[in-house]
């Protein structure tokens, strides 16, 4: 197939259906952009989860007998419990907080409660870092109910609740992207049908002189793929602009406090090839299926 003829057919088809082409480009850009946004949220959540997992601690609160009478964990009950915990293979480090230390630590984190919280409200505790914070349930189950243990609090569960919000946002973005993708598929199918119909006479003549089915249908596929590629590029540029003009300013205070991982240009560029591939593949598969179904001769 001559490249010049093929290029001319593609340009002619796009020009004839300019309104539908623009609609398809915009719909593809929106759906791919939303999908890319969902991927960035997933990447943000994964990177931020790594930050928090490095800080995750398990707190073993001790009974009132130890809290009231043992300031340095020297009683037999406290020493036995500490030795049992430190002997575990999954424990990375352990430190003891007596009641005064627990009160000071709480007031340092929440100074607004200084006038309402009494020292007796805070039990002594062990602050423990596990070798693998994700696998904390075995430790919790083994420690809970031991002599001297009041309760066990694992921050991993609190972090999971926090990131459930981010996971929910990414799910919403993916659902909206799916709806937009369905719209893009319908537009691609309609565009290919209209393009084939408007050139039915030319196609008929070409088939009469021996042109293959693939030869006559390839321009329609390329039209859809070109439009989808433009839409995907617009989506990628949109993500870069959104990162520069919106995300960086909106999330800067969270970045400074090291509460969430940064969304860098590298993250956008990381997902960009997948977005481009998705747009082209979506157009190619839809166009091919449409031609197989509606253009049978």
From Swiss-Prot:
Coiled coil: none annotated. Residues 43-171, 241-267 are extracellular. It is found in: Cell membrane. The keyword Protein biosynthesis does not apply. The chain crosses the membrane at residues 22-42, 172-192, 220-240, 268-288. Belongs to the ABC-4 integral membrane protein family. FtsX subfamily. Forms a membrane-associated complex with FtsE. Part of the ABC transporter FtsEX involved in cellular division. This is Cell division protein FtsX. It comes from Mycobacterium leprae (strain TN).
């Amino acid at each position: 197939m001559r490249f010049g003829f093929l290029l001319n057919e593609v340009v002619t088809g796009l020009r004839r259906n300019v309104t539908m082409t623009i609609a398809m480009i915009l719909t593809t850009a929106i759906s791919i952009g939303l999908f890319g946004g969902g991927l960035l949220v997933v990447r943000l959540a994964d990177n931020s989860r790594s930050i928090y997992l490095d800080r995750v601690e398990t707190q073993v609160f001790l009974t009132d007998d130890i809290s009231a009478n043992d300031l340095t964990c020297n009683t037999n009950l406290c020493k036995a419990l500490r030795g049992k915990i430190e002997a575990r293979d999954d424990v990375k480090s352990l430190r003891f907080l007596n009641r005064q230390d627990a009160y000071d630590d709480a007031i340092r984190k929440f100074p607004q409660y200084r006038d309402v919280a009494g020292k007796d409200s805070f039990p002594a505790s062990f602050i423990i870092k596990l070798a693998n914070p994700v696998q904390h349930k075995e430790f919790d189950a083994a420690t809970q109910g031991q002599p001297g243990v009041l309760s066990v609090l694992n921050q991993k569960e609190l972090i999971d609740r926090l990131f459930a919000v981010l996971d929910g946002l990414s799910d919403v973005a993916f659902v909206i992207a799916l709806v937009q993708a369905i719209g893009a598929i319908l537009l691609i199918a309609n565009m290919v049908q209209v393009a084939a119909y408007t050139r039915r006479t030319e196609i008929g003549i070409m088939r009469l002189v021996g042109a293959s089915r693939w030869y006559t249908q390839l321009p329609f596929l390329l039209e859809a793929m070109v439009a989808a590629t433009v839409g995907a590029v617009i989506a990628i540029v949109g993500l870069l602009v959104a990162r520069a003009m919106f995300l960086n300013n909106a999330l800067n205070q969270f970045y400074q406090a090291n509460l969430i991982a940064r969304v860098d240009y590298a993250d956008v560029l990381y997902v960009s090839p997948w977005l481009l591939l998705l747009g082209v593949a979506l157009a190619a598969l839809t166009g091919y299926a449409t031609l197989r179904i509606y253009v049978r001769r």
